[in-house]
Structure formats: structure tokens, C-alpha cells
């Protein structure tokens, strides 16, 4: 109940948030297409049980040097609520939190051409080798943090892993149609794998 009540303030379907979403989509099309190479190390260890896969780090994530780095991205908040912990703030805290809860974090792509943070603009994708993690960790389930990540995984990675991916809603601030309550409910599915 505590998590539910705290989450009420995070529903981003307010008028102001809708305007921010529209503004973000507008500006993403003004940005130039650029070639992006993934530079973050995957987060995992030999006790990781679930693998959370995004598509590629956003410009803001690349700026701060870590996964889901946009201040309005709800990834770390929803995972911490699902795990019953405080939201990790620093890069070190996020790594410690993920490993303590048997969560591996990476992205589907090692590189691509993309316009801003707009996954729909991705061209010439180059996939990461998921077996880097799978051969070391007892991964029981793989989750995509958005439809594009799931689509790319199924196209480029599934043939090598043989593990189906479960698609969860995006935690991106651009995904304002999904409330925090809906995110929390969707991401709660990981509990059965990490306990």
C-alpha cells in the first residue's frame, strides 16, 4: 500500500507532462541522425537471474555515463519499488542495487544510427552478444524495457540465445501514456525470478 500511495504522484498523464512528451517527440525529429556506439559495460555477476534489456543508451544516458540516465526515466524507481528498496542515486549505488537483487542490465544493440533518443529512427543496428552474460550467469528470464528492444532482440539475438524475451512497457519519459501504477504492476513480474 505504501508503494501504491507513493506512486500516485508519479503518474505522468498530467497536462504539463503531456506537453513535455510532445515537446520531446518534436525535438527528436529536429536532431541529426548520428552513429552511436555502446560504451557501457553490462551489469551482471554469477548470481544474476533476470536480464533487463534496453535498446541503446539515450543522449542523456551517454552524457551522464550510465543506463537510464535521464532524470525523468522511471526505470530505477520502479525497480527499487518492486524490490522494496530506496531509489539508488549514484552509479555505484545502482550497480550495487542491481547485483544485490540478481538483476543484470544491458542493451540489445552494440551500435546503430539513431536520431536523438528516438528508437523508431534506428538504422543499421549491430547487436550485442548476449552469450557474454548468459554463459556466466544463471539467467532465468529476459525482459525488454520497451517494444523496440523486444523487436530487435527477437530479430538479432533470439536465434543465438534460444530464450524468449518478455516485453515490458518503456520507462522513458516519452512514454507518458503509461502511468507509474501500470509500470509498477508490469515490472512486478520480475519478483518471481529474483526471490
Model-derived features: positions:
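C-terminal capping/extension of enzyme domains
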Residues: 25-49, 71, 118-131, 154-195
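Low-acidity, Ser/Thr- and Arg-rich intrinsically disordered low-complexity segments
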Residues: 4-17, 21-28
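Short, hydrophobic/glycine-enriched beta-strand segments
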Residues: 49-55
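Short histidine/acidic/glycine/proline-rich micro-motifs that form metal-
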Residues: 66, 139, 172-174
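Internal catalytic-core helix/loop-beta-alpha segment
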Residues: 100-149
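Short catalytic/ligand-binding loop motif for oxyanion handling, primarily in non-cytosolic enzymes
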Residues: 59-62, 113-116, 150-153, 173-177
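Short, surface-exposed acidic-centric catalytic microdomains
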Residues: 60-121
Amino acid at each position: 500500500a505504501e508503494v501504491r500511495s507513493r506512486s500516485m504522484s508519479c503518474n505522468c498523464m498530467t497536462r504539463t507532462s503531456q506537453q513535455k512528451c510532445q515537446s520531446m517527440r518534436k525535438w527528436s525529429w529536429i536532431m541529426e541522425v548520428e552513429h552511436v556506439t555502446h560504451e557501457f559495460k553490462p551489469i551482471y555477476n554469477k548470481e544474476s537471474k533476470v536480464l533487463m534489456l534496453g535498446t541503446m543508451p539515450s543522449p542523456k544516458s551517454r552524457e551522464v555515463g550510465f543506463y537510464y540516465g535521464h532524470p525523468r526515466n522511471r526505470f530505477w524507481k520502479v525497480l527499487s519499488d518492486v524490490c522494496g528498496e530506496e531509489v539508488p542515486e549514484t552509479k555505484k549505488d545502482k550497480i550495487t542495487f542491481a547485483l544485490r537483487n540478481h538483476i543484470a542490465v544491458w542493451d540489445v544493440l552494440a551500435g546503430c544510427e539513431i536520431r536523438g533518443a528516438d528508437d523508431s529512427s534506428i538504422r543499421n543496428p549491430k547487436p550485442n552478444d548476449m552469450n557474454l552474460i548468459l554463459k556466466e550467469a544463471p539467467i532465468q528470464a529476459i525482459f525488454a524495457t520497451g517494444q523496440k528492444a523486444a523487436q530487435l532482440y527477437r530479430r538479432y539475438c533470439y536465434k543465438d540465445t534460444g530464450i524468449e524475451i518478455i516485453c515490458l512497457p518503456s520507462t522513458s519519459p516519452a512514454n507518458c501514456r503509461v502511468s507509474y501504477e501500470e509500470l509498477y504492476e508490469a515490472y512486478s513480474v520480475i519478483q518471481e525470478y529474483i526471490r
